[in-house]
Amino acid sequence: MRLLVLSSLLCILLLCFSIFSTEGKRRPAKAWSGRRTRLCCHRVPSPNSTNLKGHHVRLCKPCKLEPEPRLWVVPGALPQV
């Protein structure tokens, strides 16, 4: 009897934890598979930024074209009127 009560309480606790840990988090933006993203590369000015052959290293990352204002929506919340 005690084992049944403890196991059901544990299941309820794990269920609540899994729901509340993901609620309100932003979903990562999906990468566009059909489009190639342009890379923005910057030369690193420090002397320690050379590779073994002596060539300068560039820091490259995807360019941000236009920052979109995203609304943060809590899943399951009712709209405010």
UniProtKB/Swiss-Prot annotation:
<feature type="disulfide bond">
    <location>
        <begin position="40"/>
        <end position="63"/>
    </location>
</feature>
<keyword id="KW-0325">Glycoprotein</keyword>
<dbReference type="Pfam" id="PF15854">
    <property type="entry name" value="GPR15L"/>
</dbReference>
<dbReference type="GO" id="GO:0007186">
    <property type="term" value="P:G protein-coupled receptor signaling pathway"/>
</dbReference>
<dbReference type="GO" id="GO:1902807">
    <property type="term" value="P:negative regulation of cell cycle G1/S phase transition"/>
</dbReference>
<dbReference type="GO" id="GO:0010837">
    <property type="term" value="P:regulation of keratinocyte proliferation"/>
</dbReference>
<keyword id="KW-1015">Disulfide bond</keyword>
<dbReference type="GO" id="GO:0050830">
    <property type="term" value="P:defense response to Gram-positive bacterium"/>
</dbReference>
<dbReference type="GO" id="GO:2000404">
    <property type="term" value="P:regulation of T cell migration"/>
</dbReference>
<comment type="function">
    <text>Highly cationic protein that has multiple functions. Acts as a chemotactic factor that mediates lymphocytes recruitment to epithelia through binding and activation of the G-protein coupled receptor GPR15. May be a tumor suppressor; together with SUSD2 has a growth inhibitory effect on colon cancer cells which includes G1 cell cycle arrest. May regulate keratinocyte proliferation. In addition, through activation of Mas-related G protein-coupled receptors (MRGPRs) contributes to pruritogenesis by activating itch-selective sensory neurons and mast cells degranulation.</text>
</comment>
<dbReference type="GO" id="GO:0051782">
    <property type="term" value="P:negative regulation of cell division"/>
</dbReference>
<dbReference type="GO" id="GO:0048247">
    <property type="term" value="P:lymphocyte chemotaxis"/>
</dbReference>
<dbReference type="GO" id="GO:0005576">
    <property type="term" value="C:extracellular region"/>
</dbReference>
<keyword id="KW-0964">Secreted</keyword>
<dbReference type="GO" id="GO:0048018">
    <property type="term" value="F:receptor ligand activity"/>
</dbReference>
<dbReference type="GO" id="GO:0001664">
    <property type="term" value="F:G protein-coupled receptor binding"/>
</dbReference>
<dbReference type="InterPro" id="IPR031713">
    <property type="entry name" value="GPR15L"/>
</dbReference>
<feature type="glycosylation site" description="N-linked (GlcNAc...) asparagine">
    <location>
        <position position="48"/>
    </location>
</feature>
<keyword id="KW-0929">Antimicrobial</keyword>
<keyword id="KW-0043">Tumor suppressor</keyword>
<keyword id="KW-0145">Chemotaxis</keyword>
<comment type="function">
    <text>Has antimicrobial activity against Gram-positive bacteria, including Staphylococcus aureus and Actinomyces spec., and Mycoplasma hominis and lentivirus.</text>
</comment>
<feature type="disulfide bond">
    <location>
        <begin position="41"/>
        <end position="60"/>
    </location>
</feature>
<protein>
    <recommendedName>
        <fullName>Protein GPR15LG</fullName>
    </recommendedName>
</protein>
<keyword id="KW-0044">Antibiotic</keyword>
<feature type="signal peptide">
    <location>
        <begin position="1"/>
        <end position="24"/>
    </location>
</feature>
<keyword id="KW-0202">Cytokine</keyword>
<dbReference type="GO" id="GO:0043303">
    <property type="term" value="P:mast cell degranulation"/>
</dbReference>
<dbReference type="GO" id="GO:0008009">
    <property type="term" value="F:chemokine activity"/>
</dbReference>
<dbReference type="GO" id="GO:0005615">
    <property type="term" value="C:extracellular space"/>
</dbReference>
<dbReference type="GO" id="GO:0043029">
    <property type="term" value="P:T cell homeostasis"/>
</dbReference>
<keyword id="KW-0732">Signal</keyword>
<comment type="subunit">
    <text>Interacts with SUSD2; the interaction is direct.</text>
</comment>
<dbReference type="GO" id="GO:0050832">
    <property type="term" value="P:defense response to fungus"/>
</dbReference>
